[in-house]
Regions:
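Short beta-strand element of Class I
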Residues: 30-32, 99
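Conserved acidic E/D residue at the C-terminus of a beta-strand in Rossmann-like folds
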Residues: 34-36, 103
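Internal, active-site/partner-interface "lid" segment
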Residues: 129-130, 140-159
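Aromatic pocket-lining residues of Rossmann-like dinucleotide-binding sites
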Residues: 24
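Cytosolic Rossmann-like ligand/nucleotide-binding regulatory domains
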Residues: 3, 7, 11, 34, ...
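N-terminal Rossmann-fold NAD(P) dinucleotide-binding loop
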Residues: 17-18
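Phosphate-bearing ligand-interacting subdomains
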Residues: 42-131, 135-137, 156
Length: 181
């Protein structure tokens, strides 16, 4: 069954925001990108449904731009913590259904959570944990933390186990490991 197309507003088109916006558009979603920097906006015009110059700290400007009509909004404003906080608050006031906000540190994370962001992400810390896991064990090809102590790990099968039936291996009984296809 094909996935329903959703609409996303990405506020802040720096490295992180533009990457998210481009990927969401590549997946077939309707994406508006917004930033104060005209150069960042103009680079996104050919790739997104819409790209606009917008001050996300201005609630009226966000309403006029129709940001309230998007299913999900991502506040990807990087260095300006005040602007990030105001943008998150404005999205909540506008009634945007789902709000993700990028934080620069733990305190910023707490503030965005208290303002009602549905998900607050710390990209550098999350990528740092991901990289450490993969560097720690060279057999790990990819790693996704699911939270609450659960992870999905793609590993290289050791040569000595190649060709063995999974049922013949004593995997999981003492380490709480589950094999996925």
């Amino acid at each position: 069954m094909p996935k329903e197309t959703r609409s996303f507003a990405v506020l802040g088109l720096g490295g992180f925001g533009s990457t998210v916006a481009l990927e969401l558009a590549r997946f077939g979603n309707r994406v508006i990108g917004a930033d104060l920097d005209e150069r960042k906006v103009s680079r996104m015009v050919p790739h997104l449904h819409s790209a606009i110059i917008l001050d996300a700290t201005d609630e009226a400007a966000m309403r006029e731009a129709g940001i309230d009509r998007y299913d999900v909004a991502l506040v990807a404003i990087g260095r300006d913590i005040k602007a990030s906080i105001l943008a998150t608050m404005n999205l909540r006031l506008l009634g945007v259904g789902t709000i993700w906000s990028k934080a620069s540190d733990r305190t910023h994370h707490r503030i965005l959570s208290k303002l009602g962001a549905d998900r607050v992400i710390l990209p550098e810390q999350e990528m740092g944990r991901h990289s450490a896991q993969m560097l720690h064990n060279p057999a790990v090809q990819d790693y996704v933390s699911l939270g609450n102590g659960f992870s999905v790990v793609n590993i290289i099968v050791p040569e000595k186990l190649d060709g063995e039936a999974v049922s013949a291996l004593a995997i999981g009984s003492e380490n709480d490991i589950r094999l996925l296809g």
